[in-house]
């Protein structure tokens, strides 16, 4: 395999919250780190520490006390290209330890990513990193491939944004894609707020990470929200303890399901938007009547914010209530869905049929960044 390793494609899934990167053909990403770039708040505090002008990922996270943290990706879309370049540089050279000029690179993008963004991504890959070939794939489509399907509707909910993406025979249907600016980060904020009401103060960026951990470890989706609230009032069956880094132990009860309930009832945090179940239904209704049956039968969950226990059953219950009564509804929640975008990319980049799909350096040199619209769709 010494030979193959050289040309093994790299797969990099850039999320709002986490970067997932690794080698095509692997079954999991080698590197998973926060999509953050930290810059020192005060220059020269750490004299003689060989202070860098910027820290990326876990290092930024661990030094967060002295840094200002920035997320270059907002709502799934790159908004700060200088920082994004730093993240890619860190991915190739520090995490994967590869020379990008020796490997084809598969990148992922949010559904409905603006055209200028795809071009900028393409340009940076070829001009800054000198990659021999690259491709840009839509995240939700990769998740569907990872589940072994080519037709279905994907609810992809990450840290910064959620999308419902109907896909037919491998192609996303852009007119029916819906975006919901409600995702993991909002759930963390909402839990911070609920905990503040109870007298626990979480305010800084560092403390937000603690709340995120509480959310990931303890939150779940109730099948029947009102009934669960009653249960929580009358018994302590939903209560769990969590030990903070300083040793203080807090007890959380109804907060455990109040937090992800926001996905189904955005009005709980004052958002005027339909919940994920309604958004999924609306997406299906924007599709041709002939393919709806295939979509209802293949609702695939993807992304970190679909990892809550109970979410698939609740989703199934809510969509059954909206859909025609005779319709067969199936909600699929693959256990590896936190990384299914990356896994789908790994599968796609290793297919022999995919090898002619790459945009090569020579094609880029000939046509410029707009080549991406002709070759990646």
Curated annotation (Swiss-Prot):
Expression sites by tissue: Constitutively expressed at high levels in young expanding vegetative tissues. Also strongly expressed in the hypocotyl and seed coat. Little or no expression is detected in mature pollen sacs, ovules, embryos or seeds.
Superkingdom of the organism of origin: Eukaryota
PTM-bearing positions, type N-acetylalanine: 2
Keyword Protein transport (UniProt): yes
Keywords: Acetylation, ATP-binding, Cytoplasm, Cytoskeleton, Hydrolase, Nucleotide-binding, Protein transport, Transport
GO biological process per UniProt: cell division; Golgi to plasma membrane transport; protein localization; protein transport; response to auxin; response to light stimulus; response to wounding; root development
Gene3D superfamilies in the cross-refs: 3.30.420.40, Actin, Chain A, domain 4
Catalytic function, reaction form: ATP + H2O = ADP + phosphate + H(+)
GO (cellular component) term, any one: chloroplast envelope
UniProt keyword Amino-acid biosynthesis present: no
Induction: Differentially regulated in response to exogenous hormone treatment. In particular, auxin is a strong inducer.
Enzyme class: hydrolase
GO molecular function terms listed in the Swiss-Prot or TrEMBL record: ATP binding; hydrolase activity; structural constituent of cytoskeleton
Localization (cell): Cytoplasm, Cytoskeleton
Effects seen without this gene: Impaired trafficking and endocytic recycling of ABCG36/PEN3 between the trans-Golgi network and the plasma membrane in root epidermal and cap cells.
Enzyme Commission number, as recorded: 3.6.4.-
InterPro entries in the record: Actin, Actin/actin-like_CS, Actin_CS, ATPase_NBD
Note: There are 8 actin genes in A.thaliana.
Subunit-structure text: Polymerization of globular actin (G-actin) leads to a structural filament (F-actin) in the form of a two-stranded helix. The binding of profilin to monomeric G-actin cause the sequestration of actin into profilactin complexes, and prevents the polymerization.
UniProt function note: Actins are highly conserved proteins that are involved in various types of cell motility and are ubiquitously expressed in all eukaryotic cells. Essential component of cell cytoskeleton; plays an important role in cytoplasmic streaming, cell shape determination, cell division, organelle movement and extension growth. This is considered as one of the vegetative actins which is involved in the regulation of hormone-induced plant cell proliferation and callus formation.
Similarity-based family: Belongs to the actin family.
Protein name as catalogued: Actin-7
Gene designation: ACT7
